[in-house]
């Protein structure tokens, strides 16, 4: 019988490359979360600054004058920051859960989810995968003889 050896790195799903990949996905999500939290804090501070609190003997129904252009620009920047932070959190969190790191992986998993199963034999294999497949085929062919 042919004695074929597989390394732990070739078989394990928890190899060094896998851990680095998952750490990169985690860091992307945490950076998006930090962006969202910072933009929420800035928006909250901006709202506190606009609050009109009259002093004693000042009218409480007459707010002080303000710039409409400045308010519109500030609202646009704060709204964009909140929307961008929330969207990136959703995208990177979903990719972290689904173990997606690249656009080709995303398109492959989306096609598989939609029911269009692509033939995996047409996909290119890396050298380690082809090595393992060849070794398994050798083992199976030797057992049949």
Curated annotation (Swiss-Prot):
It comes from the Eukaryota. The keyword Protein biosynthesis does not apply. InterPro entries: AIM11. GO terms for cellular component: membrane; mitochondrion. The chain crosses the membrane at residues 26-48, 76-98. Keywords: Membrane, Transmembrane, Transmembrane helix. It is found in: Membrane. The keyword Ribonucleoprotein does not apply. It is a multi-pass membrane protein. Its main location: membrane. Disulfide bonds: none annotated. Belongs to the AIM11 family. This is Altered inheritance of mitochondria protein 11. It comes from Zygosaccharomyces rouxii (strain ATCC 2623 / CBS 732 / NBRC 1130 / NCYC 568 / NRRL Y-229). The gene is AIM11.
């Amino acid at each position: 019988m042919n004695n074929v050896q597989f390394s732990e790195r070739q078989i394990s799903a928890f190899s060094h490359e896998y851990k680095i990949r998952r750490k990169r996905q985690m860091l992307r999500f945490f950076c998006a979360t930090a962006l969202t939290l910072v933009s929420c804090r800035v928006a909250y501070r901006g709202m506190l600054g606009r609050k009109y609190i009259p002093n004693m003997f000042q009218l409480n129904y007459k707010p002080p004058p303000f710039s409409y252009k400045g308010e519109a620009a500030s609202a646009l920047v704060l709204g964009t920051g909140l929307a961008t932070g929330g969207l990136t959190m959703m995208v990177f969190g979903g990719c972290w859960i689904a173990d997606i790191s690249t656009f080709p992986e995303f398109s492959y998993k989306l096609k598989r989810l939609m029911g269009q199963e692509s033939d995996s034999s047409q996909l290119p294999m890396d050298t380690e995968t082809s090595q393992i497949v060849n070794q398994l085929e050798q083992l199976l062919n030797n057992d049949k003889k």
